[in-house]
Design a protein with these regions (language model features):
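Glycine-rich anion-binding loops and their surrounding alpha/beta cores
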Residues: 1-169
Length: 169
């Protein structure tokens, strides 16, 4: 956020020093300087999901909001996850989408920026662990569904995401 929203540059050091979530964590997606017309947002809990849903409905954005019930602020595939969009609200299981349940150990993001970059590159180059790839596929698929305004099924959107990664495009 500090790279794109100039005002956040001044708040960043204070937020880091506090070492706990602040109101700026909630405001960040709402003050995006690019003013997106659609957005997929991961939230840490169901209270945040309800809050963002109400705000997005009022401002008229096409949205998808996701939360893994076990606390991840994205679709982690470690268990059930909830998705709410302009069109529906539903709890999914990884198996509903044809994915295996992932273990938290398979989600390690890397302790350094370089390790995180390596995982990112591995996903894009189709050499990531199956769980890492599946998590990206699931999150990307719901993002595609938001962009398509619900005109495609989630299964079609998973296929689009898979084709994109597998083809390297």
């Amino acid at each position: 956020a500090q790279l794109f929203a100039k005002a956040m540059k001044f708040v960043g050091p204070i937020r880091k020093a506090l070492q706990f979530p602040t109101v700026f964590n909630l405001l960040g997606p709402l003050v995006n300087p690019s003013q997106p017309k659609c957005q997929l947002l991961g939230v840490a809990n169901l209270d945040q999901m309800r809050l963002y849903r109400q705000v997005y409905q009022k401002i008229g954005i096409d949205y998808g909001i996701v939360n893994s019930i076990d606390g991840y602020d994205e679709i982690s595939l470690t268990g059930d996850f909830k998705v709410t969009t302009n069109d529906y609200e539903r709890v999914f299981r990884p198996e509903d989408l044809g994915f295996a349940v992932a273990s938290p150990e398979e989600l390690k993001g890397g302790a350094t920026e370089e390790e995180a970059k390596e995982i990112f590159d591995a996903v894009l180059e189709n050499r990531a662990l199956p769980a890492q790839k599946n998590i990206v596929l699931a999150n990307a698929a719901f993002g595609f569904q938001v962009m398509e305004k619900g005109s495609k099924s989630i299964e079609e959107c998973i296929d689009i995401a898979r084709e994109s990664i597998d083809s390297g495009k």
